[in-house]
């Protein structure tokens, strides 16, 4: 994950979102597939974590809270990670709102994606059996005057300490273990992620 924002261009796949047609008392009504799933309180967090995507996820979390503050929200994650600040806006909103947020990893949850996966409601964090989870320390780069480089270096160290502390709280691992395990890219299988405490269970089929 990076503590600096990376601009990403919308994918051409964004224009290929399937539409769903429903029959209502007022006739047919069409939704894009993600809007239809939002009605079921399902949010998708996919791709690079960046400001635009984070704003959309935060808006959906707040909307679903306003719709029903007592009903769970389901956050499906398939992300390689991204900006720390964008990710933390999602994380803070997850902790702020009243509904429980159940997180599900499908495909991959790496870096900030893994952090958000672990930040779901305890007992309601899941991973699909062939998914991969990866934790590591934040990435960053800066160029400029020596004094400014020193300031940014201290900032990324501060962020590293904060993330490690929160990850220790969510996993139940000692802080020194998290610091050791995030020193380099640390990939885990679904079962290993459960054992580490990043998630609570592996979902092999619906109904578990």
From Swiss-Prot:
Residues of the active site: 111 (nucleophile), 136
Localization terms from the record: Cytoplasm
Source organism, top-level taxon: Bacteria
Its EC number(s): 3.4.21.92
Predominant location: cytoplasm
Top class in the EC scheme: hydrolase
Keyword Cytoplasm: yes
Listed NCBIfam families: clpP (TIGR00493), PRK00277.1 (NF001368), PRK12553.1 (NF009205)
Subunit (UniProt): Fourteen ClpP subunits assemble into 2 heptameric rings which stack back to back to give a disk-like structure with a central cavity, resembling the structure of eukaryotic proteasomes.
Protein known as: ATP-dependent Clp protease proteolytic subunit
Organism annotation: Vibrio atlanticus (strain LGP32)
């Amino acid at each position: 994950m990076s503590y600096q924002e990376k601009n990403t261009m919308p994918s051409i796949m964004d224009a290929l979102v399937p539409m769903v047609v429903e029959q209502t008392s007022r006739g047919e009504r069409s939704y894009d597939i993600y809007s239809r799933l939002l009605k079921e309180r399902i949010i998708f967090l996919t791709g690079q974590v960046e400001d635009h995507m984070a704003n959309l996820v935060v808006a959906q979390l707040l909307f679903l809270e306003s719709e029903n503050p007592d009903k769970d929200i389901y956050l499906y994650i398939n992300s390689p990670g991204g900006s720390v600040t964008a990710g933390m806006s999602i994380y803070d909103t997850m902790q702020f709102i009243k509904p429980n947020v159940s997180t599900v990893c499908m495909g991959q949850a790496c870096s900030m994606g893994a952090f958000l996966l672990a930040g779901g409601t305890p007992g309601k964090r899941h991973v699909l059996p062939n998914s991969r989870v990866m934790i590591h320390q934040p990435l960053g780069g800066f160029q400029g005057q020596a004094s400014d480089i020193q300031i940014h270096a201290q900032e990324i160290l501060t962020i590293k300490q904060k993330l490690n502390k929160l990850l220790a709280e969510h996993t139940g691992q000692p802080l020194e273990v998290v610091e050791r395990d995030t020193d380099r890219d640390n990939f885990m299988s679904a079962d290993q992620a459960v054992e580490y405490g990043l998630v609570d269970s592996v979902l092999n089929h619906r109904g578990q």
